[in-house]
Structure formats: structure tokens, C-alpha cells
Amino acid sequence: MLFRSAREFVAHGVAVAVVGYTLCPEVGVMDIVGELRRALKSLWETTKQTPVVVGHSAGGHLAAALLATDWSTVAGVPTDLVRAAYAISGVFDVAPLLSTSLNDLVKLDAATAKAASPVYWPPPPKDRTFVAAVGGDESQEFIRQSLEITGVWSGAGVKAECVVVPGTNHFTILDELANADSAMVARVAGLARACAASRKGT
């Protein structure tokens, strides 16, 4: 769905790359994280630009995972490849899925669920920025998870914050991305410009 918002970011002078990935159950959750890591490596090799990773729902999980990735273990990219991420209605602790029908797709157990949950990973470095946006009308679990990961990461020195968007739910929050004048688009565009400027200064 995020590809429909590309023009709003282009209006702010921000280039957009929309990355697809293989879905569960064809592959596992961490296989998808690996796909996205390879995609960002390819983008770096092509553009030499630092991306701001934006994702919704499962994509929010991936945004957090890519920010928290230890890029020093990936050959051919800078160790600070991802300096900022903006997760919208993200899932940062996948353990609650174990008791739902969704686990028929993701096929996790207690150990693999914890290993796939960014909230339990070592936090990103202190100079990284992470925003978790969540709808005010979403379930308490989505709100709890956004508050939890930003609390854990900010406690570790990461510039992390939770933004609750009043009057929106898990789906209508995406309307913010369709408005070039929204606070969400402006924030993401600002992060993109800051990352680009910091890369030029290195």
C-alpha cells in the first residue's frame, strides 16, 4: 500500500524505493528480514544513499528490524546504513501471534518468536532515530507494543518516540501518507533529508 504514497514524498523532494518480499508461509519471518537486508544492500550499491525505512504493520516490524540490524556483519555497506526508521502500526513482539490463527502462516514457536521480535534485540546505536506511529483507535496490543519498544530503545539512548494519531485505526492511519501536508509525511521527509545531509558530511 505504501507505493501509493510515493508522490507525496516526491513532492517533498524525497526519492522513494518500494521493496516487495516473499510472504509467509513460503518463507519464515527471519528469511523476510534477510531479504530486506539484501534489498537495502542493493540500494546502497546503486545509489550510495542512506534510506529511511518506513513500513506498516508487518512492514513496521521490518522497519524496526532493519534499524536494529548490526550492519557491520554485512559486507559492502556502511555500518550506519540505516540511521532512521518510521514504523506505522508495527508488530515488534510477535509472541502474541502464537495463540492466533496467524501462526498457521508464520509457523513460530516460543523461541523463534522471541528471536524474530525486535523489542528483544540489542537496541540500535544511540545516534539512530526511531518513530513508532500508532492509531489512537487501534487495539490496546498495538498501542502497547509501540509504547514498549520506544520505551526500551529510548531507555538505551536511542532517539525513539511513540506518536499516537488520534481518530485513526490500523488501516485509516495510512490516510496520513496520502496527504503531502500531513505531519507524518513531513516527519518522514525531514528524517530523509537529515539522513542525506549526514551522509554527505561523512
Give residue ranges: language-model regions.
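C-terminal catalytic histidine-bearing segment of alpha/beta-hydrolase fold enzymes
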Residues: 133, 144-147, 154-202
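Conserved alpha/beta-hydrolase
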Residues: 6-26
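Alpha/beta-hydrolase active-site loop signature
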Residues: 21-25, 92, 169
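Primarily recognizes the serine-hydrolase "nucleophile elbow" in alpha/beta-hydrolase
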Residues: 38-101
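The conserved SAM/SAH-binding core of class I Rossmann-like methyltransferase domains
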Residues: 17-19, 88, 163
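The feature captures the conserved acid-bearing segment of alpha/beta-hydrolase catalytic domains
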Residues: 78-79, 84-95, 110-147
